[in-house]
């Protein structure tokens, strides 16, 4: 069956295309067929670029026949979150405010993917303007392929759902406080927030200039590494872009993790955990130990303050960016999104400065923790996804339940505040019906995505969580 191509990894598809066992046109059509069949149920795509994709696929096949093979992404379909500008193709930002915007420029990321020979098949749904977790989009909620009554998190909700359902093999998400990693966690896929500055933000609609990141989302760690390889690197068009040399992310994947030290925080990251999450997390640490890693305790004293500080910084900067739109078209925003942005406009400058000072403290603490280990492992989400119809779904990605005290939707904001890379990958499923994905999150040192990818790949070689298929077919 042609659609079975959609369940192969990017590495496998790339080799089939390179050796001309299948054509880029065949692969593209397999994914477009699934999009047409399943997207009406999931609502992951906002725009489907059928004609564009077929034309690009034919061109890729012609180049490959002529011996002009561009690399492992040549002929591979992808669909980015609809915050990335695509020249001549609508970029809605998930909002009625900009639903008719057709950019006259290209984001650096999509430009680099075009140069690598990847094929754009559409643009993916998201929380309006990437404003956080939940289900609020100007184009309707994205449903979770593992259970349509549950959220797909946010704000890169379409990306997580589309990869899980194999509507696309690759996506680009954005992440200000967990918006790549949350959707990856609840969809059973892989999401990487790179080091701040590693991937260009030119042509990406901002939410928070000092916290925004863009990065790969995929079905496997190896696929994420292939995608990162294509998009990483300095960009003079982005003032936040870093100049560090981009290493080979793919070659070291098979080196194993013998001798690596994995830090496990002694507090703040596991409070209020659902029992199934705790069990999966402990089993994940056991697998890493079996593979040769050493588990060591670490402490990040003020980690519990990361989410409130991150929210204050992010929404203050977002309110500044959207100030004119709010003044001119307030009725086009979702009411809850508008409320958050308008409220943030009244935050005190002194509070913003305090949050930035806390950010400096967290950076020192995270760097000190990573001085004693190679990476840190925490649960991606302490609890399970929220139901779409639940009261908390519009404000948070997960069921609040009996979680104590000030509830943290995830353990993600600290990586945005400090700029360290963070990788999320599946590590189990809940015991209820339907079984829902559970994920682990790995933090690394600045510009050391390679170690995170290496550990994640080793874990996936030893487990099969990433091979499970959601019940959408």
Tell me what each language-model feature is:
Residues 37, 111, 115, 164-271, ...:
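Structural helix-boundary/capping segments
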Residues 1-54, 290-292, 468-473:
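An N-terminal boundary/leader segment
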Residues 51-61, 117-118:
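Long amphipathic alpha-helix in the N-terminal Rossmann-like dinucleotide-binding domain
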Residues 73-93, 251-266, 313-367, 379-383, ...:
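Short helix-loop capping/hinge segments that flank enzyme active sites or metal/cofactor-binding pockets
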């Amino acid at each position: 069956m042609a659609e079975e191509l959609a369940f192969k990894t990017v590495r496998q598809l790339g080799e089939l295309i390179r050796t001309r066992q299948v054509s880029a046109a065949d692969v593209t059509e397999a994914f477009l067929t699934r999009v047409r069949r399943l997207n009406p149920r999931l609502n992951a795509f906002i725009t489907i670029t059928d004609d564009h994709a077929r034309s690009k696929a034919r061109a890729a096949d012609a180049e490959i026949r002529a011996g002009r093979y561009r690399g492992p992404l040549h002929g591979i379909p992808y669909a980015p979150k609809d915050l990335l500008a695509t020249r001549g193709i609508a970029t809605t930002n998930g909002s009625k405010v900009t639903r008719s915007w057709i950019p006259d420029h290209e984001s650096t990321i999509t430009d680099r993917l075009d140069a690598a020979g990847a094929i754009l098949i559409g643009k993916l749904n998201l929380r309006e303007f990437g404003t956080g977790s939940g289900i609020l989009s100007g184009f309707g909620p994205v449903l979770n392929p593992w259970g349509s009554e549950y959220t797909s998190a946010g704000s890169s909700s379409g990306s997580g759902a589309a990869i899980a359902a194999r509507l696309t093999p690759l996506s680009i998400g954005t992440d200000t406080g967990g918006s790549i990693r949350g959707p990856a966690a609840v969809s059973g896929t892989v999401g990487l927030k790179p080091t701040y500055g590693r991937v260009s933000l030119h042509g990406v609609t901002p939410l928070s200039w000092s916290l925004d990141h863009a990065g790969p989302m995929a079905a496997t760690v190896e696929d994420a590494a292939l995608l990162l390889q294509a998009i990483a690197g300095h960009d003079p068009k982005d003032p936040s872009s870093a100049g560090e040399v981009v290493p080979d992310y793919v070659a070291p994947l098979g080196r194993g993790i013998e001798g690596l030290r994995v830090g496990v925080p002694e507090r703040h990251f596991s409070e209020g955990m659902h029992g199934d999450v705790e069990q999966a997390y402990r089993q994940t640490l056991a697998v890493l130990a079996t593979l040769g890693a050493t588990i060591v305790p670490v402490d990040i004293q003020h980690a519990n303050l990361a989410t409130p500080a991150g929210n204050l910084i992010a929404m203050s900067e977002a309110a500044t960016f959207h100030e004119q739109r709010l003044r001119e078209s307030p009725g086009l925003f979702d009411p809850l999104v508008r409320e958050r942005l308008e409220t943030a406009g009244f935050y005190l400058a002194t509070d913003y400065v305090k949050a930035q000072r806390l950010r400096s403290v967290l950076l020192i603490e995270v760097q000190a923790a990573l001085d004693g280990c190679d990476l840190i492992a925490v649960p991606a989400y302490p609890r399970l996804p929220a139901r779409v119809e639940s009261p908390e779904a519009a404000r948070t990605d997960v069921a609040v339940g009996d979680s104590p005290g000030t509830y943290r939707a995830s353990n993600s904001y600290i990586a945005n505040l400090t700029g360290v890379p963070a990788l999320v990958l599946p590590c189990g499923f809940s015991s209820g019906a339907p079984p829902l994905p559970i994920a682990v999150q790995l933090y690394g040192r600045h510009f050391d995505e390679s170690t995170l990818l290496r550990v994640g790949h080793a874990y996936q070689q030893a487990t099969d969580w990433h091979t499970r298929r959601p019940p959408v077919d």
